[in-house]
């Protein structure tokens, strides 16, 4: 679970990177479909699933909106992300293993876009936070 120190580190990092969240989301989702091509199956209804396409940008923005929500609900991720968990479990039917894949891509993108802010301490706190988000999103799968 997240310590007080982890929560403070996540909030501090988010305050620095949130202005770039659309670009982070686009790059992370683009990276995910290239590095893990099996994830494209969730987007097969889109006419263009190439990195940086309009649909990828729009969904990347939506994903990062979810991350922003999670930061605001950091003290109770399960309750705060319940609606998103239900949507991913029942409507979208996303395999929860993919949350970990996308989390990894988000970490990679943030590390490359914000190398000075992505200290080892920020890295571990953000990784723990994103793992908590993935667990909260998987809550309705049980």
Curated annotation (Swiss-Prot):
Additional record remark: This fish has two hemoglobins: Hb1 (major) and Hb2 (about 15-20% of the total). They display the Root effect and the alkaline Bohr effect, which is enhanced by organophosphate and to a lesser extent by chloride.
Annotated PROSITE patterns: GLOBIN (PS01033)
Family per similarity comment: Belongs to the globin family.
Tissue specificity field: Red blood cells.
Phylogenetic classification of the source organism: Eukaryota, Metazoa, Chordata, Craniata, Vertebrata
Binding site for O2: 59
GO cellular component: blood microparticle; haptoglobin-hemoglobin complex; hemoglobin complex
N-acetylserine: residues carrying this PTM: 1
Residue span(s) of domain Globin: 1-142
Gene3D superfamilies the record matches: Globins (1.10.490.10)
InterPro entries listed in its UniProt record: Globin, Globin-like_sf, Globin/Proto, Hemoglobin_a-typ, Hemoglobin_oxygen_transport, Hemoglobin_pi
Role this protein plays: Involved in oxygen transport from gills to the various peripheral tissues.
Keyword terms of this UniProt record: Acetylation, Heme, Iron, Metal-binding, Oxygen transport, Transport
Subunit-structure text: Hb 1 is a heterotetramer of two alpha-1 and two beta-1 chains.
One example GO MF annotation: organic acid binding
The keyword Amino-acid biosynthesis is annotated on this UniProt entry: no
Binding residue positions for heme b: 88
Example GO biological process: hydrogen peroxide catabolic process
Name of the protein: Hemoglobin subunit alpha-1
PANTHER family per record: HEMOGLOBIN FAMILY MEMBER, HEMOGLOBIN SUBUNIT ZETA
